[in-house]
């Protein structure tokens, strides 16, 4: 099994078409026959032929894919902080409102963020569906609006067992 999603990515301020490789797997009885290698080469050739300059994947094993010629372009960072480490509420004008994950203002805020953030993917409809496909139903989206009711920022989060997990 093998899939390549067509996406765009901000690379140093320029928008590039990329191929996002996902769902790379094979049945155990077919491992060691070079099937994935053939599929990968064929997909990379097709991406090149369709003017996609970059191919991306989230590897389950960095050493394995590094040995196959892939390299890391970003890191996933996790922070654990106690509630007492968060500053007390600041007196900022504006307000926060929860919205549905398919809210257009939320999507526009992400597109604005992607346009100014190196390495960020622009999400098309398929990418938005995949973004929330495996999340728990309680995942929430909140938008901050300034004093002029303009959306200025967002947070995607889940509260589970009295712990807030911020996805982005």
Annotate each PLM feature.
Residues 1-7, 18-20, 25, 149-159, ...:
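Conserved beta-strand in the GNAT
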Residues 7-9, 29, 62:
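Short coil/turn motifs at secondary-structure junctions
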Residues 23-26, 32-45:
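Conserved acetyl-CoA-binding loop-helix of GNAT-fold acetyltransferases
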Residues 48-49, 133:
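Residue-level signal for alpha-helix termini/capping positions
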Residues 49-53, 59-77:
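Conserved active-site alpha-helix within GNAT-family acetyltransferase domains
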Residues 76-168:
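Amide-forming acyltransferase catalytic core, primarily the GNAT-like/NAT-type
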């Amino acid at each position: 099994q093998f899939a390549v999603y067509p996406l765009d990515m901000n690379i140093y301020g320029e928008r590039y078409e990329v191929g996002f490789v996902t769902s790379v797997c094979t049945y155990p009885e077919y491992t060691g026959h070079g099937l994935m290698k053939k599929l990968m080469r064929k997909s990379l050739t097709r991406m090149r032929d369709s003017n996609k300059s970059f191919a991306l994947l989230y590897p389950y094993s960095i050493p394995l894919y590094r040995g196959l010629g892939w390299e890391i372009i970003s890191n996933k960072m996790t922070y654990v902080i106690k509630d007492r480490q968060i500053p007390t509420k600041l007196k900022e004008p504006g307000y926060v409102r929860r919205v549905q994950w398919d809210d257009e203002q939320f999507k526009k805020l992400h597109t604005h963020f992607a346009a100014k953030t190196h390495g960020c993917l622009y999400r098309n409809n398929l990418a938005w569906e995949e973004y929330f496909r495996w999340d728990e139903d309680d995942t929430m989206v909140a938008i901050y609006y300034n004093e002029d009711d303009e959306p200025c920022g967002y947070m995607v989060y889940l509260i589970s067992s009295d712990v807030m997990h911020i996805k982005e």
